[in-house]
Amino acid sequence: MQKADKRNEIIRSFRKFARLGLDNELLSPIQIYKKIDFLCISKRSRLDMLSVYDTLRLLWLNDEKSTIEAIKSVYFDKKAHRLTKHDISTQVLSLAQENHCDERTIYRRLERARQIYEKIREREELLLDELDR
């Protein structure tokens, strides 16, 4: 899979997580797991949502609140429309201006979140494969 395709797939997972209402901070982990189980039909979709949740938890535990804020501001746009060419860059620019930081800083935070997601997703898939044996 090409790098751009993988990036787009990860962004779709983050956006779906928000669209399903799983970004609600008042939900307990058990409620989130139950909601994922109820809302996601395929095993792949469940793994994607669990990976997003685990990414956010890991970032929160590492006190990377600025990265979580970037994810929520840029990826958790609950509008149902498909992303157009400049949606993400517009949201990044807006967030950079709000936080008085450089756009590259926001992009680095988002890249870090995608890398964490990718590693978590790979590990969860390996664990699931082992359980299926």
Regions found by a protein language model. Give the residues of each.
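A short structural micro-motif
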Residues: 76-78, 116
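A short glycine/small-residue-enriched secondary-structure motif
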Residues: 71-73, 88-89
